[in-house]
Amino acid sequence: MKILIELPTWLGDTVMVTPAMDNIISHYNKPEITIIGSFVSIEVIKNHPKVVKAEVLKKNYISLYKIAKNLGQFDVYFSFRSSFRSRIFKLLISSKNKYQFERNKYQNCHQVEKYNHYINDCLKTDFKAGKLNIKPSLNSSFNYSDPVVGINPGSSYGEAKRWYPEEYAEVCAKLSLQYNIVIFGGPGEEDIAVDIEKSLIEKGILNYQNLSGKTSISELVNQISNLDLFITGDSGPMHIAASFQVPTVALFGPTRDDETSQWMNPKSIIVKKNLDCQPCMKRACPLKHHDCMNLIKAADVLKAVQSLN
């Protein structure tokens, strides 16, 4: 059974699609999975044992046409995207059966469940959404020699989801006697990582490593999977940590924790302030005070860490 799956664009969404993808695989006899999507999404899923081919989609329509024709014939096609470009690609692809995710159809539940409901609707099944399932690189033997806390201060969604570097530094200073510190971040998030690094140096904290902007997706997965503790905002790396059930403190401000919190991680705790203006779902605070993150203090996060231990 030849199956083509178009993955979501973003890192976190791609991790959250894995329970639905596993249900697709379990439904069909001898599935051969080809995945298409953004570079980030492909890097997350390419190590899955059922994936036989992976193709990065380019943005221009000529490339879409060429890729669709070069991929050949499939028995079934599932798209986990609902964009106009994805709808065009659906028309171009050769498949006996084609299904497209409808973002507005599935509401008031976790994103993992939205993707899973979509697959149940397509297949006329009643699968439950299982655990997140991403695989470390087969070539990796990475391990930390000492207990390590990872912090992930950045966010691709916008500045409204970001907590403050001085607060992260205060948390790291308190935890530095128990843990070595690793600062994570993607391209464009190096600024906040450098601010945290400067604060740590000023506090005399030297047992840290700043990896912001320096890791591939595979390296990020391998390194997060081996952490002893993770402190993060609502982000893609947060979902990687959930996949490996890393003890996690997740800070939520403008986004909906009931939809995008860690899935099935019993070692996770959410820190948020439950303000009337939450969740606004804005990239920048429309009220100009950013209290949803500004009112979270280092003491709140340290208390959450203690509750995990």
PLM feature segments, named:
Residues 1-309:
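Catalytic machinery of carbohydrate-active enzymes
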